[in-house]
Amino acid sequence: MVELKEPLATLWRGKDAFAEVKKLNGEVFRELETRRTLRFELSGKSYFLKWHKGTTLKEIIKNLLSLRMPVLGADREWHAIHRLSDVGVDTMKGIGFGEKGLNPLTRASFIITEDLTPTISLEDYCADWAVNPPDIRVKRMLIARVATMVRKMHTAGINHRDCYICHFLLHLPFTGREDELKISVIDLHRAQIRAKVPRRWRDKDLIGLYFSSMNIGLTQRDIWRFMKVYFGMPLRKILSLEQNLLNMASVKAERIKERTQRKGL
């Protein structure tokens, strides 16, 4: 299966898309055993290629033992991008997708997306907030926007699995005006898509966001503000219905921190 949009639909018409993908050269961002991420130029524009080369038996067994479906190709990200676009969540724009092969160990697939530039990750944008607090209006605006995006994502049946502020890109220029605010969520290759997001996967995304925001100087009031927008209900009701989430957020965020430090990430 191959699906191409412009300009690839014209440039690669009548050609083997997989052969064309293999010819692409550029800046390698990540090189793993089963996945390669490359930024390249085409007709004066910048794009990203993610090339998946099946998976390993070890990875399949590890995921199945954890009751998770392993990532077998680029299809998850392609479908997640389109589902998010349908529900009004800004994300990457996919212009090319292809997959071939039935054996999960050898299946090949690719996804090509437009390079979102100029942008800055929220991790970098907020990096000095703890020592150089932002305009309170801007901070509240960003908190509300991310909360709305994550709520829409979960309502659409998608959980990210790597839901950290580094995967939310703020489009530039941004001078603090709400009418110019645009944030796109990226890196959806591990996303899961269902009719409804199970509570435990919803909580994993929320705890991931909390963990990745721990060092940017957010106050307890900022966290409550996020939760009120995300859950769409008064704080008193959230505290009653979501006590389990609140109890385990700090504990699990600390575990993520320890695991991240152990892996040297």
Curated annotation (Swiss-Prot):
Catalytic residues of the enzyme = D162
Reactions it catalyzes: an L-alpha-D-Hep-(1->3)-L-alpha-D-Hep-(1->5)-[alpha-Kdo-(2->4)]-alpha-Kdo-(2->6)-lipid A + ATP = an L-alpha-D-Hep-(1->3)-4-O-phospho-L-alpha-D-Hep-(1->5)-[alpha-Kdo-(2->4)]-alpha-Kdo-(2->6)-lipid A + ADP + H(+); L-alpha-D-Hep-(1->3)-L-alpha-D-Hep-(1->5)-[alpha-Kdo-(2->4)]-alpha-Kdo-(2->6)-lipid A (E. coli) + ATP = L-alpha-D-Hep-(1->3)-4-O-phospho-L-alpha-D-Hep-(1->5)-[alpha-Kdo-(2->4)]-alpha-Kdo-(2->6)-lipid A (E. coli) + ADP + H(+)
**E.C. number(s) listed in UniProt:** 2.7.1.235
* InterPro entries listed in its UniProt record: Kinase-like_dom_sf, Lsacc_core_hep_kinase_RfaP
Which Pfam family, any one, appears in the UniProt record? Kdo
Its required cofactor(s), as named, are: Mg(2+)
Q: Which UniProt keywords apply?
A: ATP-binding, Kinase, Lipopolysaccharide biosynthesis, Magnesium, Nucleotide-binding, Transferase
Q: Does the keyword Iron apply?
A: no
Give the molecular function GO annotations.
Answer: ATP binding; kinase activity
Keyword Nucleotide-binding: yes or no? yes
Any Gene Ontology biological process: lipopolysaccharide core region biosynthetic process
Q: What pathway annotation does it carry?
A: Bacterial outer membrane biogenesis; LPS core biosynthesis
Query: What's the stated role of this polypeptide?
Result: Kinase involved in the biosynthesis of the core oligosaccharide region of lipopolysaccharide (LPS). Catalyzes the phosphorylation of heptose I (HepI), the first heptose added to the Kdo2-lipid A module.
Q: Which family does it belong to?
A: Belongs to the protein kinase superfamily. KdkA/RfaP family.
The name on file for this protein is: Lipopolysaccharide core heptose(I) kinase WaaP
Identify the coding gene. waaP
